[in-house]
UniProtKB/Swiss-Prot annotation:
InterPro entries, per database record: Membr_insert_YidC, Membr_insert_YidC_N, YidC/ALB3/OXA1/COX18, YidC/Oxa/ALB_C, YidC_ALB_C, YidC_periplasmic_sf
Location of the region described as Disordered in the Swiss-Prot/TrEMBL record: 29-76
Compositional bias ranges of the Low complexity kind: 34-43, 57-76
GO terms of molecular function: membrane insertase activity
NCBIfam families: PRK01318.1-3, PRK01318.1-4, yidC_nterm, yidC_oxa1_cterm
Protein name (record): Membrane protein insertase YidC
Keywords: Cell inner membrane, Cell membrane, Chaperone, Membrane, Protein transport, Transmembrane, Transmembrane helix, Transport
Assembly and interaction partners: Interacts with the Sec translocase complex via SecD. Specifically interacts with transmembrane segments of nascent integral membrane proteins during membrane integration.
GO cellular component term, pick one: plasma membrane
Function according to Swiss-Prot or TrEMBL: Required for the insertion and/or proper folding and/or complex formation of integral membrane proteins into the membrane. Involved in integration of membrane proteins that insert both dependently and independently of the Sec translocase complex, as well as at least some lipoproteins. Aids folding of multispanning membrane proteins.
Record membrane topology: Multi-pass membrane protein
Residue spans crossing the bilayer: 4-24, 369-389, 440-460, 483-503, 518-538
GO biological process assignments: protein insertion into membrane; protein transport
Encoding gene (name): yidC
Length: 571
């Protein structure tokens, strides 16, 4: 297989993948499905509380359904609390985070652009995080998500200059003597909001209840297009457990594979979109029952539990973190949560995700040296070219040798005509005699393909590149080139690469396909993020120089056809 043919196959494979990404996505909103409910996880044995018994049965009026129904009516303004830090502005009541703005991430680069709103009360596409308490016993008083009341009169909390932490206290008290104190803690330069619930029972009877934590969203209908980078990324719910690891479900087919009913210890749940995500992270040592469902056209993922039986005179507590923010790799790593790095969704496949994480690590190290994400991309491509040079050299040498012997192969084809068996036998004899490996040009490309595909997703998925400039006219590496300069350069690089690569023996159809390939790629790249096109231009430009050098070094003169018939072994 000569190098031009290998390039043709690889190029059309790339076209097929990109077209598949464009056309395989559904434009319709998710179809509501019946609500599925299930019991919370078995009660936990926690110091200060007696383990309770939770039946493995369907729970009427499960928390997810109740939470959605309750939120259908707007929360009174008197109950709302605003919390502002250096990175977040939250609107919440005791049990819900109703609105969340990411103050360091404007929606556009225009001056005065409002910040990204991750959680929202938009009636068309509401998105909230909910935490409340429920009970198997309908006679047991519980706060739900609405029962918590703010302690004190302050309703606007602001993290002051020099202050590193801010606490917002809530409380719920039952006539039976049960009290739940809820404390929300926000910190400087952190997107994780810490929830701590302390349950105490001063009554005369045991109290049974369990905590639930929910993400509830009506997904936005995305414009599925190569011109819309948001549609490239995974949009849906994900969860993690120590046995089955990372799992996910897209919004567009939320319940296509059934509901989720699973007890998980030390896991987490999340909803992802391009560059941003929300996640509930319960305590590592507590077990919860994870549920995936749809209620009233809204997609929910929920962790129910742990459940507690709190005896008179006893108390217990449970904690969780709510992440509301960007997919910043360094900050996610600081949370020290197993598997949380997978929310930066380079791939659903573990091997590709590991390759993507490694590539981003290298990209980040280069960025620390050069201080610019555009130049970091250039540096990463140079490093990859150096590392992969032995494979590329093998590919070029094999292709050059195949091209040199094309006159001999053409002679064999002419000699044996339609007798393909004799032609193949003679060609194998030629390969063996001249020590030609027909797969030598193909294997290196197959080895490199996972790296190139992983790098594509690194450049698309990394929020660090969002609105990051390169230089000159490129002021946002995640937006398309406004003047199409990089796509035009990419077309020129591909065209010169074709001209530099001899293609003896290629049939007319392949030649026509090759002639159109730079134009096809140019049109597609015109609407891709400029950071991705920058990668293709640098990679192609270095490849062109490498091709020129290798052709000069290993090209040689074509081996002329023989004057005597080549011997063919008889069977």
């Amino acid at each position: 297989m000569n190098q031009t043919r290998v390039f043709l196959i690889f190029a059309w494979l790339m076209v097929a993948v990109l077209l598949w990404m464009e056309w395989s996505r559904e434009k319709a909103a998710p179809t509501p499905a019946p609500t599925t409910t299930s019991a919370p996880a078995a009660a936990q044995s926690v110091p200060g509380a007696t383990p309770g018994s939770v039946p493995n049965a369907q729970v009427p009026g499960a928390p997810g359904q109740a939470a959605v129904q309750a939120q259908a009516s707007a929360t009174p303004a008197s109950q709302r609390v605003t919390v502002t830090t250096d990175v977040l502005r939250l609107v919440l009541d005791g049990g819900r985070v109703l609105d969340a703005e990411l103050l360091q991430f404007p929606q556009t680069k225009d001056e005065g652009s409002p910040p990204v709103r991750l959680l929202t009360e938009d009636p068309a596409h509401p998105y909230s995080a909910i935490s409340g308490w429920a009970s198997e016993d309908k006679n047991t008083p519980v706060p739900g998500a609405d029962g918590f009341k703010l302690v004190g009169d302050t309703k606007d909390f602001v993290l002051a200059k020099g202050q590193n932490e801010l606490q917002i206290p809530f409380v719920w008290t039952a006539d039976s003597g049960v009290t739940i104190k809820r404390t929300l803690t926000v910190s400087r330069n952190e997107y994780a909001v810490r929830f701590k619930d302390e349950v105490s029972n001063t009554g005369a009877a045991p109290w049974n209840g369990y905590v639930y934590r929910t993400l509830d969203r009506t997904p936005t209908i995305l414009s599925r297009s190569m011109t819309n980078p948001d549609s490239f990324s995974f949009n849906g719910a994900t969860w993690y457990d120590n046995d089955k690891k990372y799992q996910r479900r897209a919004f567009k087919d939320y319940l296509e594979d059934g509901t989720l009913n699973q007890n998980i210890t030390g896991g987490w749940l999340a909803m992802l979109q391009h560059h941003f995500f929300t996640a509930w992270i319960p305590q590592k040592d507590q077990t919860a029952h994870y549920v995936l469902s749809q209620v009233a056209g809204r997609d929910l993922i929920e962790a129910r539990g742990p459940a507690f039986t709190v005896a008179p005179g006893q108390s217990t507590s449970t904690e969780a973190r709510l992440w509301v923010g960007p997919k910043l790799v360094n900050l996610i790593a600081k949370e020290d949560v197993p598997g949380l790095d997978r929310v930066v969704d380079y791939s659903r496949f573990s091997m590709m995700a590991v390759i993507g994480q490694g590539l981003f690590w290298v990209l980040n190290q280069v960025h620390k040296l050069v201080g610019n994400w555009g130049w970091a991309i250039v540096g990463l491509v140079v490093l990859l070219k150096l590392v992969l040079y032995p494979l590329s050299a093998t590919q070029y040498k094999s292709g050059a040798k195949m091209r040199r012997f094309q006159p001999r192969i053409a002679q064999l084809k002419e000699r044996y005509g339609d007798d393909r068996q004799k032609f193949q036998t003679a060609m194998m004899e030629l390969y063996k005699k001249e020590k030609i490996n027909p797969m030598g040009g193909c294997l290196p490309i197959l080895i490199q393909m996972p790296i190139f595909f992983a790098l594509y997703w690194v450049l698309v998925e990394s929020v660090e590149l969002r609105q990051a400039p390169w230089f000159g006219w490129i002021q946002d590496l995640t937006a398309r080139d406004p003047y199409f300069i990089l796509p035009v350069i990419n077309v020129a690089v591909m065209w010169f690469t074709q001209k530099l690569t001899p293609a003896p023996g290629m049939d007319p159809m392949q030649q026509k396909m090759m002639q159109f390939m730079p134009l096809v790629f140019g049109v597609m790249m015109a609407f891709m993020p400029s950071g991705l096109v920058l990668y293709w231009v640098v990679n192609g430009g270095l490849g062109l120089l490498q091709q020129w050098w290798m052709t000069k070094r290993h090209g040689g003169e074509p081996v002329p056809a023989t004057t005597a018939p080549a011997p063919v072994k008889k069977k």
